[in-house]
Every structure is written in C-alpha cells, then in structure tokens.
Design a protein with these regions (language model features):
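Non-transmembrane, aqueous-exposed alpha-helical and coiled segments at domain scale
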Residues: 1-423
Length: 423
C-alpha cells in the first residue's frame, strides 16, 4: 500500500478538513505532517460546526487511527482546549489519536516572541497568526527546541527553563511593549502537558513503516496551502514549514517511493488571509459577495479573508511542484449568481505575457490577464449528481481540467460532508 497525500493548492483555507472527513472512511490512518495550531480545519455535519487546529480531521470516524506527525508543532494549551471541546461528542481520542515523540512543542515564550517580532516589523508585518509557529520552527532548525518525547524525561522542567531563559533574553532585546504574566502562562502550560502525557506517544516513522508493510491505507493531511510553503510560496509572506508534497516525507518519516495519489484541493475562486501578494484580489462588489456568501473569515484568527478570481497561473505552479494526480474543487456553490466568471490564465510581467509564476508577484509587478466564462444562477446545495449540475458549471470544470491537465474528481457544493459530488 502507499501513502496518499491531501494538499491545499492555494494560500490555505481550501477546505481540507471537510474533504479529509469525507475521504476518511476509505483509509485506516490519517496523519498530519506539518504546521501547527495556525491551521483551522473546519468540518460540518449533523448541523454542528467543528474546527480542528492540531488534531487530524479523521478523528470523528471511530475506525480510523489519527497521527500527529513529527513535522507538526504542538501547543499543549491549544491541544488541551481541543480535547475539552471534543469531550461532549464521545470521540474515542485515547484509542484513536497517536502523537509523534519527535513533534516539537510550542512554549508560551514562543508565542510571546512571535508577538514581539510581528509588532517590531511595523508596516512590514507578514500577517502572523501569533501562535508561536515561526519561533518554534526556528528553535527546531537551530537545534534548541523541546519535543513531545522530552515530557517523558525526568529533567523536562530543567530543559524547559533553560530554553525559556534564552527566550526572555531575546524578548528584552525587542523595542516593543508586550504585556504578559509568564507565571500564569506557565501554570496553564504545565497543566496542559499533563493532558498530553495521557495520550499514546509513538515513534511515528516506525509505526507508519510497519503499517505500510501490513497493507494499511494511509492518508497524509497537509495544513495551510502550497503557496505558503517556506521554499516555494510567496516568500516572506509564507508559513514556516513545507506545505508541498515533499513535506509529507520529512514530516512523517515515509520514503518518497511510498507516496501514491497526490490529491490537490482548491477553491473555485481564490482567497488569502493576512499580508502578501494576491494578483487577482477583488475590491469590488464581486469580492464582497465571495466574502459574505463563502463565509470567508479565518477559522483560527477570525480575520476576514481577501477574495479574488481563480488564479490558474499560481494553481498550475502548485500542481507542478507537488506532482498532483487528481483535484478537488471546493465552494462551487459560492459562485452561483454571477453572470460572468473570470479566470486568470496568464500575467503581464515586465511588458511580456507569461504563464508561469515569476520570482516576484507583487501587485506592482504583475497584471492578471483574464479569460471570461459564463456564470450560473442555480442553487447547487441540494444537488447530489454531477449530471444535474448546470452546464455553465460543468463547462467551468472542463475548462480548468484542460488548462491544468489534471482530472477534477470531486466538486463540493456546500460545507456539509453530504454536499460533495464525486465524478
């Protein structure tokens, strides 16, 4: 058996949580491989909306094992809150949730460093979620970090104190005023660490290796989106981990030859949270409609998402970098009501028309070139069969498939798991 990947192909918020939830019944194991509580994976079913930040999106299926991989960074405080929020739903967490010992811990001082760093940048802010993600990954690559496995050691508190002393020295060097009570934050942190200790801690690379040998079906769940990748995203307006397909190998400890299908998810339009270039962004009534109808507000921060037409140049780039083999189109229902739809098929860049993503896509450097397609007005939310979709929508899908040269296997027409059309 192989490990299939599920990746976001835009700037995050594509709807990965819902699709993982839909796909879970076909897999034995769901594994998160990067990111942290800056992710907000939203699932809706039985009239209830759930938002997961650290726990994999397969947790609501009683037969699936869910793994938080070594590439993830975990804030014990936020993890405990997620556990508490799931308590009323009788989710079998202790049996079905496994955590890699090699996953790094987000400390309270990481969040403080994140806030101080962002505040010190003034107008050059990158739009951090202020969850401590960046500073934690910096400690990881700087070989200073604490890992989940360290909480099992007798000297964990001494290791913690050694690192936080360094953090406090760094905080003192920032010329910004960050108000905090570290004793209160630490009390909450160590209480949450006790909860974390109560879960099954594993060597996830060995666990997954044995699972593959036994023929288990595994789905690797990414967070954020490909255009936020630390290497291939719109740097520096990116996250601190590898969100593309390669990140699954390093974030779980699986070999490249073990990768099977690479499923890429994208919205029928484009959104972005926070700062950074966005060539197809809309500032008119069309953009406002996408925001309101699509409920485009961040699941983690509550921030309003910027909205714009689908950018095929950026989408093709994401498909190429990860070797996507099949596509899932989300939120087709949000585009109902537009007379005309626009799709960016190329950029004007330095006086030339190009169809690839250049080094710098700041708004002053690229102008989107659009192809127009006919819109539709039919309400899609109760449609269950692809043949019942309006012709204008199937024409839209056909156009995208031709441009991307990858099949679109699923079209989502609403937030609930039942509002999913498979071709």
């Amino acid at each position: 058996m192989a490990v299939d990947l599920l990746l976001g192909l835009q700037w995050g918020d594509e709807g990965k949580g819902k699709i993982v939830d839909v796909l879970t019944q076909g897999y034995d194991i769901i594994a998160r491989f990067q990111g942290g509580p800056n992710a907000g994976h939203t699932l809706e079913f039985n009239g209830i909306k759930h938002v997961l930040h650290t726990i994999p999106s397969g947790i609501f299926h009683p037969t699936s094992i869910n793994i938080i991989g070594n590439g993830v960074v975990i804030d014990p405080i936020i993890f405990k809150k997620e556990i508490d929020e799931l308590a009323p739903y009788n989710v079998p967490l202790k049996d079905n949730l496994l955590i890699s010992r090699k996953a790094h811990l987000i400390l309270p001082t990481h969040r403080l460093l994140d806030a101080a760093s962002e505040a010190s940048k003034g107008k050059a802010k990158i739009g951090s979620t202020l969850k401590g993600i960046g500073p934690t990954y910096m400690d990881k690559t700087g070989r200073n970090g604490l890992r989940v496995g360290d909480i099992e050691l007798d000297d964990f508190e001494a290791r913690y104190r050694n690192l936080t002393d360094k953090h406090e020295e760094m905080l003192a060097n920032y010329k910004v005023d960050i108000q905090y009570n570290l004793k209160e934050l630490e009390a909450e942190f160590f209480e949450a660490v006790k909860v974390l200790k109560g879960f099954q801690l594993i060597d996830s690379e060995e666990y997954l290796y044995q699972a593959l040998k036994q023929g288990k079906k595994i789905l690797a769940e990414g967070a954020q989106g490909s255009l936020l990748d630390i290497d291939f995203g719109t740097y520096p307006f990116v996250t601190s981990s590898n969100t593309t397909a390669a990140g699954a190998c390093t974030g779980l400890g699986v070999a490249p030859r073990s990768i099977g299908e690479v499923i890429g998810i994208f919205k029928a339009y484009t959104t972005r949270v926070g700062s950074g270039p966005f060539p197809t962004e809309l500032f008119d009534e069309a953009g406002e409609t996408m925001t309101q109808v699509g409920r485009e507000f961040g699941a983690t921060t509550g921030r309003r998402r910027r909205c714009g037409w689908l950018d095929l140049v950026a989408l093709k780039y994401a498909v190429q970098v990860s070797g996507v083999t099949q596509l899932v189109m989300m939120k087709a229902d949000v585009l109902s009501g537009f007379d005309t739809l626009k799709v960016c098929t190329s950029y004007l860049y330095k006086g030339k028309e190009i169809k690839h993503l250049p080094y710098n896509i700041e708004e002053q450097n690229v102008t989107p070139v659009y192809t127009e397609l006919k819109g539709w007005h039919q309400n899609l939310t109760d449609i269950k069969d692809y043949a019942q979709l309006p012709k204008e929508l199937t024409d839209y899908v056909d156009f995208l498939e031709k441009e991307l040269e990858i099949p679109i296997k699923v079209v989502s027409v609403g937030p609930d798991r039942t509002q999913t059309i498979t071709r």
